[in-house]
Amino acid sequence: MIANLTRAGMLGVAGWALVTPAVAQNARSASVEVMTDEVRRGLSWTEGRVAAAGDVRVSLGPIDASARAVTTRGSARHDGADAVVDLVVGTGWDLGAVRIRTDAIGHAFAGARGRMDYVEGAVSASYAYGPVYATLGATAAPSQRAIGGSNVYLYASANAGIPGTPLTILGELGHSTGSVSDPVRAERLRPGGSYTNWRLGLEHRRDRLTLGVDYVGTDVDRTGDANRFTDRGNVADRVLGRVQISF
C-alpha cells in the first residue's frame, strides 16, 4: 500500500511539474474536494465509497493545463488502482458568441495490477444566454489495450444560477459508444456496451466553499455478465454529496 501511495504521489508531483512553471503569474485555481463517490459518466470509480481529490489549474497565454489526483481505493474497474491522476492541456477561443474548446487528456493510474493508463481528446462548444450556460461536447479515446478498444462520449450539459439565491442548478445527458477489440477490458468504460447516463445537481457557493448534491444514473443493465473490470453494483440511480474548498 505504501508503495502504491508513493507512486500516486509521484504522479501527482509530475502533474504539478507540468503546470507549475506558470503558477507564479498565471495561477487560476487550486482546490481540494471530498465526495461520497467518484462518479464519471454515471459509473463509480471508487466502488461506491468516499473519495478525496486535489487539483490545480494554471494558464500560460492561450494554453491552460490542469492536474487532478483522485483516490480510487482499489477499484475493480481500474484493476485495483489506488489513485488516478488526470492531466489536461487545452485551449479555447471565441467563434462569435460561441466558446470553442479543445483538450488533450491523460489518465495515469497508481497501484493497478496491470497497465490501466489511457488518453483521450475532447472538443466542446458553449453558449451563454442570460443565466444559462450550455455546452455540447465530444470526448474520444482512440483504440487502446487498456480500455479494450475505442470510446466516444457525446454529451449535452447546462448550468444556471437560480435568481435571488446562491444556488446553481446543473444537468447533463451523455451517451458512450465505441469499438471493441477486447470485450473484457471494454467493460471498464462501457459495461454492457453502449449506454446513456444522466446527472441533475444543485450547488451552493459561498466564498471558497462549494457544497453540492447530485442525482446521477445510467441505463446499464445491472444483471448482465460481470468480469474483473465490471462494477455493475454501482451504475444505478443514486444521490451523491460533495464538498470543495478552493484556494
Regions found by a protein language model. Name each.
Residues Y118-R190:
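Detector for outer-membrane/organellar transmembrane beta-barrel domains
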Residues V34-R40, L60-P62, A69-S75, G106-A110, ...:
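Transmembrane beta-strands of outer-membrane beta-barrel pores
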Residues L200, H204-D207, Y215, G233-F247:
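Outer-membrane beta-barrel "beta-signal"
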Residues R28-V32, G54, I63-A67, L87, ...:
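Transmembrane beta-strands of outer-membrane beta-barrel proteins
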Residues N26, G48-A52, A81-V85, V98, ...:
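Residues that define the transmembrane beta-barrel architecture of outer-membrane proteins
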Residues E47-T102:
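Glycine- and aromatic-enriched membrane insertion/assembly motifs of diderm outer-membrane
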Residues G42-E47, A76-A83, A112-V119, R145-N151, ...:
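Outer-membrane beta-barrel translocator domains and adjoining extracellular loop/strand segments
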